[in-house]
Swiss-Prot record:
Its main location: nucleus. Transcription factor that binds to the E-box and functions as inhibitor of transcription. DNA binding requires dimerization with an E protein. Inhibits transcription activation by ASCL1/MASH1 by sequestering E proteins. The gene is Ferd3l. Residues 103-155 form the bHLH domain. This is Fer3-like protein. It is found in: Nucleus. GO terms for cellular component: nucleus. It comes from Mus musculus (Mouse). Heterodimer with TCF3/E12. Interacts with the bHLH domain of TCF3/E12. Signal peptide: none annotated. Detected in the developing central nervous system, in particular in embryonic ventral neural tube, brain, and spinal cord. Detected in embryonic intestine. Detected in embryonic and adult thalamus, hypothalamus, midbrain, pons and medulla. CDD domains: bHLH_TS_FERD3L_NATO3 (cd11415). Residues 65-81 have a biased composition (Acidic residues). Keywords: DNA-binding, Nucleus, Repressor, Transcription, Transcription regulation. The keyword Nucleus applies.
Amino acid sequence: MAAYPESCLDATVLNFVADLSLASPRHPLLCEFPPGVPFGDRTLGYREGRPGRLSQFDERYQEVEGDEVEYEDPEEEEEEGEGRGRVASLLGRPKRKRVITYAQRQAANIRERKRMFNLNEAFDQLRRKVPTFAYEKRLSRIETLRLAIVYISFMTELLQSKEEKEAS
């Protein structure tokens, strides 16, 4: 206890630690574990009333990874040579891994390069239309968009004020 400063060790903290170490059921933050349930069981959250995933509501479902779950049908007899369960999405359809070929990846890279080229060209055209000082460095995309918004607003107000003067 000498490693902790005295201010951190008030009576509440010491009582809580003592209750934890003695497994006293009188502390409100402690919960009783049913017999036979290992500590950290995923179904424990459901028993405590916490919202959980599908695997917590039915023991036939087991989480595999991400949004995938593995369903084990207790009535279905499987042989050793077959798979030990079907991996399915949450919609119940079989999960099929998408295989991307080298040619598809190359085509996607070309499309992405073309998209970025067109986007950069559009920003360059916008930079030429928006007035800036000649000695300024090249504006970033966000600076270009913000300056364009200000410029368009200014030009709109200028036109509206000119129309009001002509009308009166």
